[in-house]
């Protein structure tokens, strides 16, 4: 069970990661990351279970540049709920290197799924166990 208060901001990444000791292969893919905020633009869901520190797309892009990662899958987190705008924004800014996994409700429409696909989302996830988010 999550014992972190929603009011406690949790750092979820290293501010100064060190360069990797090995050279990654061509087309290396980071297969599961999240982006958070900035909150001034992408509100956190009131239903979230914790409050991660902002980890915007620019930090992700800088990390990937440092590590030599050329492709990535960004997974929508419960932090932003089913408003997938933060991932959509990162995909758009990623220059074709990023794809997404959207978080949707069970009653998502075919039209919304088509829209998400047109914006670079290639999968969806559901959150059946909200207490674990």
PLM feature spans:
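An N-terminally biased module of ancient metal coordination in phosphate/nucleic-acid-related enzymes
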Residues: 2-82
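Active-site gating/metal-coordination segments in enzymes
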Residues: 4-12, 81-133
């Amino acid at each position: 069970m999550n014992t972190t208060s929603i009011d406690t901001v949790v750092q979820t990444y290293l501010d100064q990661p060190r360069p990797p000791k090995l050279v990654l292969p061509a087309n290396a893919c980071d297969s599961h990351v999240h982006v958070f905020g900035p909150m001034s633009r992408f509100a956190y869901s009131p239903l979230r279970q914790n409050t991660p520190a902002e980890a915007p797309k620019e930090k992700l892009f800088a990390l990937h540049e440092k590590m030599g990662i050329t492709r990535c899958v960004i997974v929508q987190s419960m932090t932003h709920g089913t408003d997938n705008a933060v991932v959509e924004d990162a995909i758009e800014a990623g220059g074709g290197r990023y794809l997404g996994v959207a978080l949707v409700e069970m009653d998502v429409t075919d039209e919304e799924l088509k829209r998400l696909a047109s914006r670079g989302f290639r999968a969806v996830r559901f959150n059946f166990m909200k207490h674990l988010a």
